[in-house]
Amino acid sequence: ITKNDAKKILSALESLKNEKFEAFSGAEDIHELIETLVIKKAGMISGGKMHTARSRNDQVALDIRMKIRDDINIICNCLLDTIEALVSLAKNHQKTIMPLYTHLQQAQVGLFSHYLLAQADVLFRDFDRLYTTFNHVNQSPLGAGPVGGTSIPIDRHSTAKMLGFDGVIENSLDATSTRDFVAEYVAMIAI
């Protein structure tokens, strides 16, 4: 893709950011819709090159991974904020006495700070699980093509780095065909 084509494609994509689209546009999926709109704005010669060395298979896998990655970052930041608030509150209640319960009955006298720190510990384990999931999700599938890679020489690692991924998924079938990372994410947020 020439610099001129890239500028036209990027300009078209930028102009689409704030547009609203009809759900029933006739496009097979969001990728076809975006490609059609980019071609309308940038022209067929430039816009038609947008998917060079890419397939919908690796793009869909990429989109899902980027969305989950963003969601995990948001959730982890919320967890850290909540943990910080619980620890701060616990510092202010180091001498506050409260009843501790077991089997729906008061069992012992304890400290409110002890209770708060127990909740912080639970949330930290949630954070730790999500962070591990993030590491599994944050691998780029781009360049895997539909299932067997691309014949166009590309630097998958460079693309991955530009998009904020820690690395690439080496096996093209794994990159485009599996969704175990989605199941892992759903399982982690279900806890």
Locate predicted features.
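A helix-coil-helix interface module used to build multimeric assemblies
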Residues: 1-149, 153-162, 167
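Acidic, glycine-rich loop-and-beta core segments that form the ion-binding/anion-interacting portion
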Residues: 163-191
